[in-house]
Structure formats: structure tokens, C-alpha cells
């Protein structure tokens, strides 16, 4: 009855019997999935990678929280499934809704009004309770409708792997899921106190590793996910090497060196159909690598929209970023006066650290017509900045991969980056007509940029050289 109806609704798990040699179904768990929900790069990846895998014939379903308001972005149909989760002496119940991404990939949204009935994705300090319960609900779903692979992302869903490992590790009969964990940013680990873990039903030793413990009396959800996963991936080869060192390992470098044989650095990509200046509906004009006139119009329109001097020969530098220490925006502030003195225009869009926001706003007040600062998150303006900018600045202190440089390339904006993590893997130093960008701020400080242009043959090479998830998946 209800189970058959539910199983039929979740079409890629419609049968328990799988042909020998068939591609195993994947259950993909993420706290955010664009375009349903998005704060940063995780949402972009969760919306793009499953679509690329599905295009290659991989049966895949995404599970994500049902935040208030996502039903306004995509139609959601209620399924006859309810997941019950024990949490701190009570039972939390999750309803299940089904939607489809524009690519056709099935998304299951787990609804619990108390935990996720708000329009925000992250809500410190309640995130511990919210994502612990969501991870348990996702694990319960995997127990009811067993896939072949469960793929979790970051600490928000790593606990699902811990539950599945606990339930199935010692069973010789029945399904044994392959457990995959992708680390998008090692700095966020889901650290909480031991007492809370016990109230969830864990024994302390299940989540505690004294030799890799950063803070006494705490548990580390991401560390436990790393420990139980059959495969661990991160979003660039360089970042996979960096996180095994004390400098970038965030206290888990020893554990990651211990699991190095299971650790893979796979470079991120973007959805080149979603990010396509030839079809992007929010741009004032369209263009592609062969016909670049539209980019000139986009630059002029952006200058007008942001109150910058309308000068087609001025170098326009775009910054679309969180305002925080990791992203290196304070490093940009240290040299930005010199950059501006070279004739560079700045268009910044970002949210985060209020102090950094005030510093950039003061800069805009000092240089009207040359610096524009918009504080907040505006995905439409972000794409217009990529389309109108000549260069995009990414001065990150560390960067697991970064998508801004890839989106910039797709829209014909040359990336200027610090050589770290995925930025080092995706941006080849510009030399004559070779390379894809600059790996330091030095070029901006050494030259006058009052007469800026890129030869059209070079621009075409930049725009066509973008890493897409389809290309990355086929390569694997």
C-alpha cells in the first residue's frame, strides 16, 4: 500500500532488486541546493553535480531540508512518507515533499516546522539540533529505501553516515551502503559537547577521538564522518594536500593523514548551462566567446546601475564574496588605495563581517564614481557584476576550490587570485595569450589600467576553458 506508493514516487529507488553491473543509485545529502536554497558554493555544487551525474546515467536523488519559502521557487508535492526521529527524549516527525530541479533530478525536501519552518538556512546556535535531526531523518530514509551510495556534504549531513555505519556495519545480510563524504570547508566541523551526543543516543566513544580532539569535552561530527566514510573527497587536489598539514588542517590533519588512502581531491566545476552569458535572462545584453559586443553593453549598464563613471576603457574589477577573514577582503583593503590610484573601478557585492562592510562602505564614500559597494546577497546583481567586470578579485587566504573564478571566466572576467587551494588548481598564470588569470595582485599595482582591453581571441579562450561538472564527471 503506502510503502509501494512511496517507493514508486521515489523512482530511482523503485525496486530493491538491482541488475548485476548496474550503476548503484545515489542518495545525495546537502544542507542547501540551488535554486531551492543557497547561501554559498555548497548550494551551487549540490544543484549542479547531481545533474551532471544524472546526465551520465547515474540514478540520483537529493535530500535537503524544506525551508520556509522553497515551495515558492519550485512546486512541491507531498509524499505518503513520514520519518520519525528520536531527539532528546522526544520524537521529531518529518514530512517529505518531492520536487524536480530544472535538470530533472528528483529532490526530496524534509519538512519539520519547528526546526526548519523559517526562511533562513543557517541559524546559529540552533544548527546543532536542526542538522543532527535532519541527518538522522536522512539516515532513516536510507534505511527504508536503500540506495547503493549515500553521499553526504560537510558536517551538516555527516552524522547520517555515522548512523548508517552504526546500523549496518556489522550486518552480513541486507544492504550495505557505500558511504561518501565531501568536505567543502574543513573549518566548519559541527563541534558540540559530549552530553548532547549521549542525549542523542550515542556513546561518547562513538564520536570522540582523543588523539584528534581539538577541544576537551566535545565531540566532532565531521571528524567522525571522516572516520566512517568509505571515500572522502574534497573540492580540489591542492586543498586535499593542504588539509593534511597543520597550517590548513583545522586540527584534523592527523586524522586526514590517517585516511589519506581514501582521500581524493576532485576539482569543482560549474553548471555551464546555468551560467551562460549567451542565454542569461538577467543580463542587459547577451554574448558568447565569438560575439563579445554584448559584454561591452553589460559593462556600460553595470557602471550606470552602480553609479560608476561610464568609461568603457577603465578596468572594472568585480568582487562577489562573503566578507570574512577566509576570503581575504582585509588583505584587499590593505592595497586597494594603490589599485584605485591606477585607475581601476571597484564593484563589490557581499555580506558578512559588519566591520569589513563599514570599511568598504567608507571607501565608496571616499571614491564616488570609482567604487561601488552593495552589502547583502543579490544573485541577480552578482551575475551582472560577472558580466560587466573585466576582472574578478579573489584574494582568499585559503580556498577549498572557489566558484567565483570559474563563473568569472565563463562570463569573460579575468580572475585575479591568491595562489591557494582550488584557486591554484583552476587559474593558470597569464602570459601573453596563454593562461587564464593572475595569481597575485601585483599586476594591478604595477600598471596603469586606464586603457584596458583583452584581445578577442584571448577572451574566447578564457570563456571556453571553464571547468564544468559534466567535463569533470566524464573524466572520472
Predicted regions and their residues:
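Catalytic cores of nucleotide-sugar-dependent glycosyltransferases that transfer UDP/GDP/TDP-activated
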Residues: 2, 7-476
Amino acid at each position: 500500500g503506502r510503502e509501494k506508493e512511496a517507493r514508486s514516487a521515489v523512482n530511482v529507488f523503485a525496486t530493491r532488486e538491482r541488475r548485476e553491473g548496474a550503476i548503484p543509485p545515489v542518495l545525495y545529502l546537502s544542507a542547501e541546493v540551488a535554486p531551492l536554497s543557497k547561501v554559498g558554493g555548497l548550494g551551487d555544487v549540490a544543484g549542479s553535480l547531481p545533474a551532471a551525474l544524472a546526465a551520465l546515467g547515474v540514478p540520483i536523488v537529493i535530500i535537503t531540508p524544506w525551508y520556509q519559502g522553497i515551495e515558492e521557487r519550485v512546486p512541491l508535492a507531498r509524499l505518503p512518507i513520514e520519518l520519525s526521529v528520536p531527539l532528546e527524549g522526544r520524537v521529531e516527525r518529518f514530512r517529505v515533499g518531492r520536487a524536480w530541479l530544472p535538470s530533472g533530478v528528483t529532490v526530496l525536501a524534509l519538512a519539520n516546522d519547528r526546526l526548519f519552518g523559517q526562511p533562513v538556512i543557517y541559524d546559529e546556535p540552533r544548527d546543532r539540533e536542526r542538522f543532527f535531526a535532519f541527518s538522522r531523518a536522512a539516515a532513516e530514509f536510507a534505511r527504508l529505501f536503500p540506495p547503493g551510495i549515500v553521499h553526504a556534504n560537510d558536517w551538516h549531513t555527516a552524522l547520517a553516515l555515522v548512523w548508517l555505519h552504526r546500523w549496518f556495519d556489522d550486518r552480513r545480510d541486507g544492504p550495505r551502503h557505500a558511504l561518501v563524504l565531501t568536505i567543502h570547508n574543513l573549518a566548519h566541523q559541527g563541534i558540540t559537547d559530549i552530553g548532547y551526543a549521549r542525549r542523542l543516543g550515542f556513546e561518547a566513544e562513538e564520536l570522540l577521538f582523543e588523539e584528534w580532539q581539538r577541544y576537551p569535552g566535545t565531540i566532532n561530527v565531521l571528524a567522525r564522518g571522516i572516520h566512517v566514510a568509505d571515500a572522502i573527497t574534497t573540492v580540489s587536489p591542492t586543498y586535499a594536500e593542504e588539509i593534511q598539514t597543520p597550517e590548513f588542517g583545522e586540527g584534523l590533519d592527523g586524522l586526514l593523514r590517517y585516511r589519506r588512502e581514501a582521500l581524493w581531491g576532485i576539482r569543482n566545476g560549474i553548471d555551464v548551462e546555468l551560467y551562460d552569458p549567451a542565454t542569461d535572462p538577467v543580463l542587459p545584453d547577451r554574448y558568447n566567446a565569438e560575439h563579445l559586443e554584448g559584454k561591452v553593453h553589460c559593462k556600460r549598464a553595470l557602471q550606470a546601475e552602480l553609479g560608476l563613471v561610464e568609461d568603457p576603457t577603465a578596468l572594472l574589477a568585480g568582487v562577489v564574496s562573503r566578507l570574512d577573514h577566509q576570503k581575504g577582503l582585509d588583505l584587499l583593503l590593505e592595497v586597494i588605495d594603490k589599485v584605485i590610484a591606477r585607475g581601476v573601478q571597484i564593484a563589490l557585492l557581499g555580506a558578512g563581517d559588519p566591520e569589513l562592510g563599514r570599511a568598504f562602505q567608507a571607501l565608496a564614500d571616499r571614491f564616488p564614481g570609482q567604487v561601488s559597494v552593495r552589502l547583502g546577497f543579490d544573485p541577480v546583481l552578482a551575475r551582472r557584476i560577472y558580466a560587466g567586470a573585466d576582472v574578478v578579485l579573489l584574494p582568499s587566504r585559503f580556498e577549498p576550490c572557489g566558484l567565483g573564478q570559474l563563473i568569472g571566466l565563463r562570463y569573460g572576467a579575468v580572475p585575479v587570485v591568491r595562489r591557494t587551494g582550488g584557486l591554484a588548481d583552476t587559474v593558470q598564470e597569464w602570459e601573453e595569450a596563454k593562461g587564464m588569470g593572475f595569481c597575485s595582485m601585483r599586476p594591478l599595482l604595477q600598471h596603469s589600467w586606464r586603457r584596458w582591453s583583452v584581445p578577442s581571441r584571448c577572451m574566447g579562450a578564457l570563456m571556453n576553458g571553464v571547468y564544468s561538472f559534466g567535463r569533470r564527471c566524464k573524466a572520472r
